[in-house]
C-alpha cells in the first residue's frame, strides 16, 4: 500500500487526498515488503456499534462522527510488522520482522502495567477512565487500539477524548 513516513501510517489509494497523506498532507511512498497483518476489517461492525451505541466512548461528537465515517469507508487489514529495516521490537515468530510502531506503542498501555505476566497493576488500573489524545491520533486510539483489545477479549478504555490543537 501507500505509506506516510512522518505519520508512520499506511493508506489505500482511495484514502489519499490529492495523492497525499490525508493526515499531514505530505507525499506518500508505495511500500512493498513482506509483512504480517492484523484482521482489522473483522472489527468494523463492533466498532460502529461502539461509536453509535456508546457515544460517550469517543468525544467530542465531531471526532466520533469522523471515526464513524472512516469505518464506514471500509477498514483495511492492518500491517503490523516491517521487514525492510531492523530497528524496533522483533516479531517473536520471525526475527526478520519488527513490530509496526503503533502496535507496540498502543500495547504499552497495558504491558507497562504488567499484563499478561504480572497482572496486579493491570487489574488495579485497567480499564482506564479516560485516554486524552490529540486529534491526529484519534484513529489509532479509537479504531486500532479497541480492535486489538477486542481481539484479546480485554476491556476497552471507558472514554477517549480527542482534543484539537492549541495554537499560540
Question: For each predicted feature, which ranges?
Answer:
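Structured secondary-structure scaffolds
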Residues: 3-6, 20-168
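Cys/His-rich Zn2+-binding cysteine-cluster or related metal-binding knuckle/ribbon modules and their
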Residues: 1-16
Amino acid at each position: 500500500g501507500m505509506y506516510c513516513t512522518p505519520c508512520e501510517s499506511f493508506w489505500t489509494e482511495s484514502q489519499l487526498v490529492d495523492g497525499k497523506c490525508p493526515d499531514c498532507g505530505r507525499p506518500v511512498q508505495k511500500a512493498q515488503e513482506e509483512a504480517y497483518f492484523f484482521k482489522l476489517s473483522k472489527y468494523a461492525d463492533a466498532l460502529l456499534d461502539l461509536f453509535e451505541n456508546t457515544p460517550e466512548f469517543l468525544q467530542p461528537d465531531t471526532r466520533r462522527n469522523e471515526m464513524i465515517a472512516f469505518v464506514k469507508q471500509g477498514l483495511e487489514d492492518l500491517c503490523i510488522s516491517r521487514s525492510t529495516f531492523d530497528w524496533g521490537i522483533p516479531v517473536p515468530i520471525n526475527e526478520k520482522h519488527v513490530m509496526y510502531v503503533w502496535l507496540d506503542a498502543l500495547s504499552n498501555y497495558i504491558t507497562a502495567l504488567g499484563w499478561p505476566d504480572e497482572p496486579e497493576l493491570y487489574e488495579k488500573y485497567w480499564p482506564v477512565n479516560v485516554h486524552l489524545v490529540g486529534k491526529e491520533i484519534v484513529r489509532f486510539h479509537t479504531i486500532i487500539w479497541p480492535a486489538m483489545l477486542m481481539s484479546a477479549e480485554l476491556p476497552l478504555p471507558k472514554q477517549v477524548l480527542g482534543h484539537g490543537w492549541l495554537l499560540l
